């Protein structure tokens, strides 16, 4: 046991940043509601940072904060604030002003090229063939996600479709993020912190012991999460 009641350690977390391009709270509220409806398992009750650097018109910050919070998102800080008065209002509400890393200047867009003839159809799968490390979040919108390497604890895989992990799975896997209850999770070594299909989830201690560390397939049966051997 430590001799001190607390211990400070550096750490890193992956957070979504909502860039506000409109100063009207009602417009922001509706836009966020629409976005959350597209991927409720991914965004519902998610912690977010609000970036206000693009706001040109004055904003009622109290109303804006209420509009965002009413969607279920949890505002944990604000970035991109250069206006002294707005900064004072934000800090008065107890929210920290955060500094984001410097963004690289965008490279000039390449000259447009004529479309190639006889192009092959796009495959609805996102493939990751490198290890997914702690703090990384990978999202595969409207498709399946395949990872051919290990997924570390603290990493997060999210897909609107199925998730396949052909390595040790220690992180979090959320399939069917947009609500598709027919999606499944396939792991060759199931040691996940959390598994979820369309919002139905298990934490690591809820995974049946006989499947922990084994090849497994997870799916919903009668709206309940189930697991079986992966043959």
UniProtKB/Swiss-Prot annotation:
<comment type="subunit">
    <text>Interacts with MinD and FtsZ.</text>
</comment>
<keyword id="KW-0132">Cell division</keyword>
<dbReference type="Pfam" id="PF03775">
    <property type="entry name" value="MinC_C"/>
</dbReference>
<dbReference type="GO" id="GO:0000902">
    <property type="term" value="P:cell morphogenesis"/>
</dbReference>
<dbReference type="InterPro" id="IPR036145">
    <property type="entry name" value="MinC_C_sf"/>
</dbReference>
<dbReference type="InterPro" id="IPR013033">
    <property type="entry name" value="MinC"/>
</dbReference>
<protein>
    <recommendedName>
        <fullName>Probable septum site-determining protein MinC</fullName>
    </recommendedName>
</protein>
<keyword id="KW-0131">Cell cycle</keyword>
<dbReference type="InterPro" id="IPR005526">
    <property type="entry name" value="Septum_form_inhib_MinC_C"/>
</dbReference>
<keyword id="KW-0717">Septation</keyword>
<dbReference type="InterPro" id="IPR016098">
    <property type="entry name" value="CAP/MinC_C"/>
</dbReference>
<dbReference type="GO" id="GO:0051302">
    <property type="term" value="P:regulation of cell division"/>
</dbReference>
<feature type="region of interest" description="Disordered">
    <location>
        <begin position="100"/>
        <end position="125"/>
    </location>
</feature>
<dbReference type="GO" id="GO:1901891">
    <property type="term" value="P:regulation of cell septum assembly"/>
</dbReference>
<comment type="similarity">
    <text>Belongs to the MinC family.</text>
</comment>
<dbReference type="InterPro" id="IPR007874">
    <property type="entry name" value="MinC_N"/>
</dbReference>
<comment type="function">
    <text>Cell division inhibitor that blocks the formation of polar Z ring septums. Rapidly oscillates between the poles of the cell to destabilize FtsZ filaments that have formed before they mature into polar Z rings. Prevents FtsZ polymerization.</text>
</comment>
<dbReference type="GO" id="GO:0000917">
    <property type="term" value="P:division septum assembly"/>
</dbReference>
<dbReference type="Pfam" id="PF05209">
    <property type="entry name" value="MinC_N"/>
</dbReference>
């Amino acid at each position: 046991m430590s001799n001190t009641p607390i211990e400070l350690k550096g750490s890193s977390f992956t957070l979504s940043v909502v860039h506000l391009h409109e100063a009207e709270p009602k417009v922001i509220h509706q836009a966020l509601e629409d976005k959350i409806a597209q991927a409720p398992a991914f965004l519902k009750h998610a912690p977010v940072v609000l970036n206000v650097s693009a706001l040109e018109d004055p904003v009622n910050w109290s109303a804006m904060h209420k509009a965002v919070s009413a969607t279920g998102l949890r505002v944990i800080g604000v970035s991109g604030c250069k206006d002294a008065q707005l900064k004072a209002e934000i800090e008065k509400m107890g929210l920290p002003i955060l500094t984001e890393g410097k963004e690289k200047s965008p490279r000039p867009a390449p000259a447009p090229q004529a479309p190639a003839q006889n192009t092959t159809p796009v495959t609805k799968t996102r493939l990751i063939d490198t290890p997914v490390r702690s703090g990384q979040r990978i999202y595969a919108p409207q498709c399946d996600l395949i990872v051919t390497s290990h997924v570390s604890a603290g990493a997060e895989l999210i897909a609107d479709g199925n998730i396949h992990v052909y390595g040790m799975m220690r992180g979090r896997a959320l399939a069917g993020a947009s609500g598709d209850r027919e999606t499944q999770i396939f792991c060759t070594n199931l040691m996940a912190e959390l598994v979820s299909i369309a919002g139905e989830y298990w934490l690591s201690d809820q995974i049946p012991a006989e499947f922990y560390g084994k090849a497994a397939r997870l799916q919903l049966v009668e709206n309940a999460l189930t697991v079986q051997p992966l043959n």
